[in-house]
Amino acid sequence: MPGLSTTLASISLPSCLMNASGAWSGTREEPRELAASATGAVVIKTATTQARVDAVQGCGLENPGQPYYLAVLSALKAAGKPIVGSVAGFTTAEYVELAHAYAQAWVQIVELNLSDPIVPCNRGGTCDLAAVEAVVKAVRAAVPVPLAVKLPGLPDGAVGHAVERLRRHQIEVCVCHTPQLATFAPALDGALDLMAVGGISNGKDAHGALSRGAKAVQIGSALMQEGPGVFARIQQELIAERAIHETSA
């Protein structure tokens, strides 16, 4: 939609809104429904090397395994929407394997999910920045496509250290929790594109995140409640919100 387009890692997106990796992307049909909606990109549900059934409640990593999603990708090509393949490994080698497979399968951006509480980088909700760096370094060396790193919530004092590690290995996109935008944006200082996730349910939320430095936002809970039509609604609200702020400026 005019005025709402953006770029992530130099890739043009028709809209700054997209789904979060766990929302409306778990079956073969749901990514197709997203591709036909007003979303700016289709984020495939976080994949692991093998199927995970009855994973730890709330961890978000229950999935049928990456081969299932690789089979979905071919059907999405015709839609023309950029594809983000989200991956989670339990070793650095698994992250490399998963990212490489998506890089070979027409995925424009690979998202490294380092935020889930059962992955080694964030075991029990405590982020190990040395482990984060080991993963991003290995994947960057093996994968030529743009990389987005989804980080867990961090203490404010740790944000600068995390950003330094991402910059060191030429990561293109940082995905952070929306409440931490005010901390991440100045630390990144434009070196990486910033994407917000969490708590975006209307145009006002989206405008707030974008005005605090995000180039795009991911929508999860609102999408699950309303379905893919949520993107058109939030887009219209975002346009109205921008008009209000432009008038009052």
Question: Predicted regions span which residues?
Answer:
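Short His-Asn-centered micro-motif
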Residues: 20-22, 151, 197
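Glycine-centered helix-coil hinge/cap
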Residues: 65, 189, 227-230
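Short donor-sugar binding/catalytic loops of nucleotide-sugar-dependent glycosyltransferases
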Residues: 200
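N-terminal capping/small domains of soluble enzymes
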Residues: 1-83, 88-90, 234
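Short, acidic/turn-prone active-site loops that include or flank metal/cofactor-
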Residues: 46-49, 178-179, 221-224
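Alpha/beta enzyme core
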Residues: 32-37, 41, 90-195, 203-219
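Structural signal for hydrophobic packing residues in well-ordered secondary-structure cores
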Residues: 77-80, 106, 140-143, 188, ...
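C-terminal helical cap(s) of enzyme catalytic domains, especially alpha/beta-barrels
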Residues: 52-57, 210, 216, 221-249
